Regions:
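Non-catalytic accessory regions flanking glycosidase/transglycosidase catalytic cores in CAZymes
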Residues: 2, 6, 11-252, 258-267, ...
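Extracellular loop and loop/strand-boundary signature of outer-membrane beta-barrel proteins
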Residues: 289-291, 345-346
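Flexible glycine/proline-rich, aromatic-decorated loop/lid segments
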Residues: 270
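Active-site His/acidic residue clusters
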Residues: 273-290
Length: 523
């Protein structure tokens, strides 16, 4: 999670690449409000890993305390301390992987503060996010319990900035050693007879910023030292994720790789945010177009970073993990006072941004391993919002519903799409139709985003390498890009059935302005 680094830097330092690798193959110029495309069902890109739909929870504002965790004695309906309605919504969506405890918070978090009897845990100041005191009641056991409740695989971010190799090594043993060692027996004494079997371990977070302000050469040395001691226990595989660049900072990545030599990680992270110049509910058309167009350049970053790592022999086996991404709007002071730091409403514009990102991940399925949007509840581009720490209401945001529309892609084979939409001006990025497709057992799933605030589109989609007789579509749409789901109107923006027709080998539908759609095609 970004600390004091200006968030606009996250989209800087890009280098020029061929547009052909970044956008769907072109089949001619876009005309008026019509967009033509061809799904190439026999040209596979890669598997749409469920982990592309990962999430992130940090001790920040009311994400954990008051959002996910209310405590067992809370008047808020709960399941052993976890907010019941939030758990039910997250289970319904399916959360493949959840990253915790940060973010910036991770590099000041000492895991032993969060184990043992809750009343005996030390109270610590959260130095990164407001200086408030946390009671430590949500720690490792509570996080693993949440993951098990919602069906998520845990991803733990270790402390490099203020921690030590010994501390992180012990955390892994505590979590994964079945029994027999002092640390494993301590876990058992604390109520967990079975090991937690945590595979994913982040070795620091944003080490170029809030994780220690390190030069890439310095962090590479730290990573090499840590990796010597971070072993696997009890048959649980170890997947270490190194802290990666600030946005698309290719210079940082190259210096890290040049210094790394031994100690190759299984994965390397990158973070990508695009800021907003307006309050989430009061975006102008000009700023909307600018934000979404620049945000779409995450595709450049993915392609360029993957290419850079592949240029190193040892880098070809390092997975690319986009473990923080999303839109970061101008936060309203009144919202933070009422609901917590970085509390951000999600609008139809936010849903379009989510759809743009998820389409990009499908199109670049051969280059990515995991993606985690920031964050899961109450903070930035979240899935859920709650009405204050003691409030009993949880609502699903427009971003939640965008993720729901893409859920059926998980595990499918992403395939290529030819389209007549194009981003033509690299210096002044523009918006147009965004599309991706996947297939499985004869089914074709087509996802489309119309991020244009002022133009409805007619879609004409041909199929190659497959046929379809039946089609159904779901549409998430509101002509007002500032529309949101509120506590008074929690279902204002929700997916609804949408007309679609198959005419011979062509699929046709109308795609209104500011909308996200998924079309399911079957033989």
């Amino acid at each position: 999670m970004l600390g004091k680094i200006p968030r606009r830097r996250f989209v800087g330092d890009a280098v020029a690449v061929s547009l052909g690798s970044l956008v769907p193959r072109l089949v001619g110029a876009a005309t008026g409000g019509t967009r033509r495309m061809t799904v190439l069902a026999d040209e596979e890109i890669g598997t749409v890993r469920p982990e592309f739909h990962g999430h992130f929870a940090e001790h920040l504002g009311s994400c954990v305390y008051g959002g996910l965790w209310v405590g067992k004695n809370s008047p808020v309906p709960n399941i052993s301390g976890y907010r019941r309605q939030a758990v039910e919504y997250l289970k319904e969506l399916g959360i493949p992987v959840l990253r915790w405890p940060g973010g910036c918070y991770a590099d000041d978090y000492h895991w032993r503060d969060g184990i043992g009897p809750a009343e005996s845990r030390p109270k610590r100041v959260n130095i990164h996010w407001g200086g408030y005191v946390e009671d430590g009641s949500f720690g490792t056991h509570e996080f693993i319990g949440l993951c098990r409740l919602i069906g998520a695989e845990p991803y733990l971010a270790g402390n490099v900035g203020s921690g030590s190799p010994q501390e992180m090594r012990d955390w892994i043993e505590y979590c994964n050693m079945p029994s027999g060692s002092t640390l494993a027996d301590e876990r058992i004494k604390n109520g967990a007879t079975e090991p937690f079997r945590v595979r994913y371990w982040g070795v620091g977070n944003e080490t170029w910023g809030c994780g220690g302000w390190m030069r890439p050469e310095v962090y590479a040395d730290h990573y090499r030292q840590f990796s010597v001691y971070l072993r696997k226990y009890g048959g649980t595989e170890r997947f270490l994720i190194a802290s990666g660049p600030n946005g698309n900072d290719t210079r940082w990545s190259r210096k890290f790789m040049d210094t790394l030599e031994g100690g190759k990680p299984e994965g390397i992270s990158m973070h990508y945010y695009e800021g907003g110049e307006d309050h989430p509910l009061h975006f102008t058309e000009e700023h909307l177009k600018k934000q979404l167009a620049v945000f779409s350049r995450v595709e450049d970053a993915i392609v360029q970073q993957r290419s850079l790592f592949d240029s190193y022999r040892e880098g070809r086996q390092i997975a690319l993990v986009l473990d923080e991404w999303g839109v970061w709007d101008r936060i309203a002071e009144e919202d933070e006072k009422k609901f917590g730091k970085l509390w951000q409403q999600s609008t139809m514009r936010s849903a379009a941004a989510a759809g743009l990102g998820l389409n990009i991940f499908n199109r670049q399925a051969d280059k990515l391993y995991m993606c985690n949007i920031a964050q899961i509840v109450n903070v930035l581009q979240s899935l859920l919002l709650t009405d204050g720490p003691e409030g009993k209401q949880s609502i699903r945001t427009t971003t939640y519903h965008a993720f729901a529309l893409f859920k059926a892609h998980r595990g499918n084979s992403a395939v290529k799409v030819e389209t007549d939409s194009a981003i033509s001006d690299r210096e002044k990025p523009s918006l147009d139709l965004s599309v991706s497709a996947s297939t499985k057992n004869g089914l074709v799933l087509l996802s489309l985003v119309n991020p244009l605030p002022d133009e409805d589109l007619e879609i004409q989609c041909a199929l190659r390498g497959t046929t379809a007789k039946n089609a159904r579509a779901l549409l998430l749409h509101d002509p007002d890009w500032n529309a949101s789901n509120s506590f008074d109107a929690p279902d204002r923006v929700v997916p609804k059935p949408h007309p679609v027709r198959v005419e011979g080998s062509t699929v046709r539908l109308d795609l209104p302005r500011m909308s996200v759609a998924t079309v399911t095609l079957t033989p």
